[in-house]
Amino acid sequence: MLILGIDTATAQVSVAVGGHEGVLASTQSVRGRQHAETLVPSIQFVCKQARVELSEISVVAVDLGPGLFTGLRVGVAAAKAMAHALRVPMIGVSSLDLVAFPLRFSSKLIVAAVDARRGELFTAFYRQVPGGIQRLTPHHVVSPDDLSSELLATAEECVLVGDGAVRYREVFEGLHKVEIIEEGLAYPAASSLVMLAHAQALREQWVKPWDLQPLYLRKPDAEINWQTRQDEP
């Protein structure tokens, strides 16, 4: 089984290929919002590095968000098109799950925080379990100050990870028992996507391309701006 993982939910574009033998090749780049221009060359690069032909891919996995609306649309649309063309199933994974996954060996409460722009964060809480992580809360949207209050209320050691944690570091760095993970793990990675998708694929927990939808949690900024203008006197 070979899985192609595509992640464009944040400022970073990440692509990976892997399967039973683990991750065979991966790449990530941050080029502003040039997701469409970066994605195809990234797919070509990892396939070449892994010595894999696209026709050998048996599952396409994609980051469903939450994250940047434009990036999500690019990644999900491309993943759907590839799965349809290759006639293979798909697996979708949350960006917050992907951000939390590299910390699966931590005994602390894991808090993933992805920058939602507009002074807000997409967040969820996780705990280490045998073989990975378990989400303890629904995905939700909060302000940095509200998340800070949530962390204070837990009264246990926490590890805070994600580009939202990095952006609003000054809000969290004074909190007792809260460790902020540095920028190296700030973005979801397609390598984590491949590993999580592989576990789901073994359980045949996949979906048809037309059934897979992005996880937005909030209206697009363009729609919010339009509604704001309509509400003005």
Language-model segments: which ranges?
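N-terminal beta-alpha supersecondary unit
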Residues: 1-66, 187
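Surface "functional belts" at beta-alpha junctions
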Residues: 22, 34, 89-188, 202, ...
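Stable alpha-helical structural segments in soluble proteins, enriched in small hydrophobic residues
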Residues: 46-50, 85, 103, 190-201
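Generic secondary-structure signature for well-ordered alpha-helical cores
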Residues: 48, 52, 152, 199-206, ...
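Phosphate-handling active-site elements
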Residues: 48-55, 83-95
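Flexible, glycine/charged-enriched surface loops at secondary-structure junctions
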Residues: 57, 206-209
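DPxDG-like acidic metal-binding loop motif
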Residues: 61-90
